[in-house]
Every structure is written in C-alpha cells, then in structure tokens.
C-alpha cells in the first residue's frame, strides 16, 4: 500500500495490574522487550510518569539500562523523559552512560509536559513555569553536547559529550511540532492519548521543517493503541482495562490497572464515555483483520514514517499475544 519503509515500534509504561507489584511489572517489561527484539520491533521506549500507582516507569533511564543489559540488538529509549523535571546536564550524563554501555542502541525522546500533578512537581524540586519556558534552550543544549559542541565552555557531560545520541521531540500539541521543525529533529505525536491536534501538528512539522546536521527531511512517528486478540469480542473485553483507567484518571482517582469488565456502560457516565472515547480514538481494537483495516487507514491518513504501538492489558500473556498479532499485521501489510 506504500513504497516507503515504515518502522514499527513499541511504547511501554510498565503498567502495574491490580494485585501485582512494580517488581512484576519490570519482569513483564523484560518479557515484552525480548518479544519486541525477537519479532523485529524497531525501537522500544519507556515513558516517564511520577506518583502514579499503576505505572512503574518513573526512573526511566534506570529501566532502560535494565532492559538493554538483558537484550542484544533492540533500540531502547525514553518516550519520553520530561525535560522540565531534570537538569539537562544530568540527562546528558545518564544517556551518555547508557550509550557508552550499549553503543548505538539508545534514543532520547524529550517531552515538555510534567508527567505529574502539582504536588509531585514540588516534590521533584522544580518551578514549572520557568523550566517549561527554558525547554527550547535545554533541548538545544543537549543536542550541542551530544554533537560535541560547547554551549557552556566550562561544563561537559562525561560520558555524553560527542555521543551522537538520537534526540526526538515528543508532544500532543503544535508547540512541540513547531520546535522539532525549527531544530531539524524527528517528531513523535502522542495520539495514543491526545489525538485532537494530530493532523495539524503533522502538517505544521512537515511544512516548517528545517534540515539539520541530524536530519535532512522530516521524520514523523505516530503513536497509537493496539489491543489485538483472536476475536473482536476478546479484544474489546481486554480494552476495558484501559478504558477504566482513563475514566479513573478523569475522576482524579489513582490506582493500578484494573481487570477487564463485561459492561462499561455500568462503569462510566455518558460524559465520561464521550471523553474517554475521544482520548482513545486512535486505538485499534479487534482481531487481525479489524486491526489491519484500521492500520491501513491510519497509514494512509497520516503518511507516518513510523508507528509506535502502546497497549495496556491486564493479563500479561494476553498483552504479549496482542503485540505478536500487531506485528503479524504489520508484516502482512508492509513486510
């Protein structure tokens, strides 16, 4: 359906199902990373979140190191590190260390959102407005260090300086798309939970892109959810765990990933249903035939260079099977 090569990648939040633990979530992430490597997923990213009892990927760089040490060829990275939470120097050192240990296998995806609530921001010892205002400068500083330039002649990250680590900008708004275009960096859009501005952002990024030493032409990744099973009914049942989690988030409730339920109408209100369905509208839920049809439409409409797949499923084996089926569909469509 397309002549260009389209990579297929995987996003992991290290979800903690109800009754489980962070330790089990890390074990499950390792299973998933090994599956991703075996099946040919191009890259495997982990997302930074804080103070969320159902997500274990807070110390993103540490978890990347754990997975890299237990795989061989898989590209691993952050999807993303929320840069306003951190000193650029510390991030350069952390990812420089990772790239020194696992050369050519590490990506740094950067986000501008806090990935946390206001109390957690204070616990992270940061001042939100100032740090967000500094985001373009902080990104440029990281890129300069990785490209062996000296934004500060008295400070260098060791390791990190000159490491040529791939840097991505992530976002769900026009801001990140514009900045990625201006800096000549690859861009990933978080349509798996905030799809509203997807097409505007892709157009803005592509039409304003300035070639750089890192990237000659725009490269856009689109992140979607895929919940695949052997039948549509089974997939829709598994999907209710994510739907419940999104409802609870909107209610201001915390908790681990809930088990699936038979009837969402007994769980959410009509307004909650509308909001969650909008947020999760870039979700392909069904058997291979249904997922294939949906993926064809997304590729045609977005002209994405890369698809990143997310999927939070309560049962670990069902989650592994879903990512197996997703790759089956990719191979059938794109080789």
UniProtKB/Swiss-Prot annotation:
Transmembrane segments: none annotated. It holds the Pfam family Bac_luciferase. The keyword Oxidoreductase applies. One of its GO terms (cellular component) is cytosol. Gene3D superfamilies: Luciferase-like domain. InterPro entries: Bact_Lucif_Oxidored (IPR050766), CmoO-like (IPR019949), Luciferase-like_dom (IPR011251), Luciferase-like_sf (IPR036661). One of its GO terms (molecular function) is oxidoreductase activity, acting on paired donors, with incorporation or reduction of molecular oxygen. Keywords: Oxidoreductase. It comes from the Bacteria. PANTHER family: LUCIFERASE-LIKE MONOOXYGENASE (PTHR30137:SF6). To bacterial alkanal monooxygenase alpha and beta chains. This is Luciferase-like monooxygenase. It comes from Escherichia coli (strain K12).
